[in-house]
């Protein structure tokens, strides 16, 4: 009976690896989008970004 049950440790390790890959992928995408957004804001939304920052405080 125990032979039918899949080993828990390798599946757990695979899950951790998968989650790490997913988090890294999301982090890279978010940083890239943030950098592009900041670049665009600094290019043609300088006054608007300053106004939003002043009103957010």
Curated annotation (Swiss-Prot):
**Pfam families (UniProt xref):** SH
Cite the ranges annotated as topological domain Intravirion.
Answer: 30-57
Virion surface side of the membrane: what ranges?
1-8
- Membrane topology term: Single-pass membrane protein
From the UniProt record, give one GO term of the biological process aspect: symbiont-mediated suppression of host NF-kappaB cascade
- Give compartment(s): Virion membrane; Host cell membrane
Do the record's keywords include Transmembrane helix?
yes
Name the GO cellular-component terms.
host cell plasma membrane; membrane; virion membrane
Residue ranges of the TM segments: 9-29
Mind listing the UniProt keywords for this protein, alphabetically? Host cell membrane, Host membrane, Host-virus interaction, Inhibition of host NF-kappa-B by virus, Membrane, Transmembrane, Transmembrane helix, Virion
- Protein role: Plays a role in the inhibition of the host NF-kappa-B pathway. This inhibition occurs at the receptor level, by preventing the signaling of TNFR1 as well as IL-1R and TLR3.
Quaternary structure and partners: Interacts with host TNFRSF1A, RIPK1 and IRAK1; these interactions interfere with host NF-kappa-B activation at the level of receptor complexes. Interacts with host protein UBQLN4.
Family the entry assigns: Belongs to the rubulavirus small hydrophobic protein family.
Protein name, entry field: Small hydrophobic protein
State the organism named in the record. Mumps virus (strain Matsuyama) (MuV)
Originating gene: SH
């Amino acid at each position: 009976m125990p032979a039918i049950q899949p080993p828990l440790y390798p599946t757990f390790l695979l899950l951790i690896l998968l989650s790490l890959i997913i988090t890294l992928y999301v982090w890279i995408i978010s940083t890239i989008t943030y950098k592009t957004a900041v670049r665009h804001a600094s290019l043609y939304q300088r006054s608007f970004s300053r106004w939003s920052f002043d009103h957010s405080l």
